[in-house]
Structures are given as C-alpha cells and as structure tokens.
C-alpha cells in the first residue's frame, strides 16, 4: 500500500516538472490593436532581408492581433510545405501569447507537455513570435523554410523591426 503512495507522489512530481516547461507565464502581454500595414511592411522587409543575407529560402506570414492575414511572402525556391507552416507558427505564437518554440520545448519534454498535441490547429515548431508594440501583442510573425533556429532568427529580425 505504501509503495502505491510513493509511486503516486513520484508520478505527480514528474508530471508537474514536465508541465512546468509550458507553465502559464505569471503575466503575458495583453492583445492590442491590429498591427498597422506600415509596421507589417517593416517587419516583413526586415525578416526578408535577414533570410536573404543568409541565403535562406523561407515563407513569411504576418497576422494581426485578431488572427487575420496581413502579409505573406514566399521567397523563390521555398519548399511548398513552408507556406502553411509559416502561418501555423504565427498563429500558434499569437494564440498562446508566446514564441511557438515554447510549445516545441514542452512537447519535447514529454510528460504533461504531450497534452498540447491534442490542441487543434497548432504548429509547435520554432519560428513563430508575437509582435509587440507598447507592450501589447499587435500581431505575430511566422517563418518556415530553413532550420528551425534560422526560422526563429528571421522571425526575430521582423518582430524587432517594429518593437517599441
């Protein structure tokens, strides 16, 4: 009987640790007004420049704070799967108010993080970031086509171009 209690405590501790990889942040930024077209163009240009200077062929998606498509670019010779992946990464970052890599990490950690796989229409891969202006989420950018870390680097260049 006592071993069941110990096993239960160990299991609970393991699940708590695995779930902490994706614990709700104490304070996530609120949603703000939709990203302006000028800011979206600035983010897109910066992301495209980052990808081009590194010879990465990527697809780049920018959504507004309501999840609506504002801009999309597919660079020459980008694999077709990157079209939907870039939008999925942006949508994931927007709906979870955090980089899409946070979900990637939570799932990779296993345990309770695997529950994220049950969430419909997420793309838990690195390369999606919320776009913040004045501390509010005005949209998100998603990039796909290179290595995930390179996608994230490209997305960061775009998000940083409009961050205030």
Question: What are these model-predicted stretches?
Answer:
Residues 1-8:
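Bacterial Sec-dependent N-terminal signal peptides
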Residues 8-20:
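Bacterial N-terminal signal peptides
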Residues 22-164:
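Flexible, solvent-exposed loop/hinge segments and secondary-structure transition points
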């Amino acid at each position: 009987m006592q071993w069941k209690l110990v096993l239960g405590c160990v299991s609970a501790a393991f699940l708590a640790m695995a779930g902490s990889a994706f614990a709700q942040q104490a304070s996530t930024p609120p949603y703000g007004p939709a990203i302006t077209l000028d800011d979206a163009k600035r983010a897109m240009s910066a992301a495209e420049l980052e990808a081009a200077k590194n010879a990465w062929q990527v697809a780049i998606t920018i959504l507004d704070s309501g999840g609506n498509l504002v801009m999309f670019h597919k660079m020459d010779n980008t694999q077709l799967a990157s079209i939907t992946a870039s939008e999925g990464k942006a949508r994931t970052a927007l709906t979870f108010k955090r980089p899409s890599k946070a979900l990637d990490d939570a799932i990779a950690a296993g345990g309770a993080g695997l529950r994220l796989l049950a969430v419909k229409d997420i793309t838990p891969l690195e390369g999606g970031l919320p776009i913040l202006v004045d501390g509010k989420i005005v949209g998100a950018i998603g990039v796909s086509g290179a290595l995930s870390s390179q996608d994230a680097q490209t997305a960061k260049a775009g998000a940083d171009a409009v961050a205030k």
